[in-house]
């Protein structure tokens, strides 16, 4: 195979890896935890991965404790639990 063909193949494999969503088995375990606002009383908008709907959804975080399924932005949630 020529060097141009190898570069094309490498480029296609890289593109495929970037566009392939994360499978349920590849997600961090905390992505399957329910939203947990914690015991504090702040009203901070955060996002969590809902494993039933398979989407990142908004919830109100109280500001302390909770769990790791708690993201400042929908993009961070999506990148971590849905895929790149």
Curated annotation (Swiss-Prot):
Domain BPTI/Kunitz inhibitor: 31-81
Residues under site feature: Reactive bond for trypsin: 41-42
Alphabetized GO MF terms: serine-type endopeptidase inhibitor activity
PROSITE patterns named in the record: BPTI_KUNITZ_1, BPTI_KUNITZ_2
Disulfide bonds: 31-81, 40-64, 56-77
Location relative to the cell: Secreted
Pyrrolidone carboxylic acid carried by residues: 25
Keywords: Disulfide bond, Protease inhibitor, Pyrrolidone carboxylic acid, Secreted, Serine protease inhibitor, Signal
Primary localization: secreted
Cellular component aspect of the GO annotation: extracellular space
Signal sequence range: 1-24
Taxonomic superkingdom: Eukaryota
Any Pfam family matching the protein: Kunitz_BPTI
CDD domains: Kunitz_PPTI-like
General function of this protein: Serine protease inhibitor.
Name under which the protein is recorded: Kunitz/BPTI-like toxin
Organism (species): Austrelaps superbus (Lowland copperhead snake)
């Amino acid at each position: 195979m020529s060097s141009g063909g190898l570069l094309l193949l490498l480029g296609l494999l890289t593109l495929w890896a970037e566009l392939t969503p994360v499978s349920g088995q590849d997600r961090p375990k905390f992505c399957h935890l329910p939203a947990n606002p914690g015991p504090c009383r702040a009203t901070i908008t955060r996002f969590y991965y809902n494993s039933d709907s398979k989407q990142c959804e908004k919830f109100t975080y109280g500001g302390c404790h909770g769990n790791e399924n708690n993201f400042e932005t929908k993009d961070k949630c999506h990148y971590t639990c849905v895929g790149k």
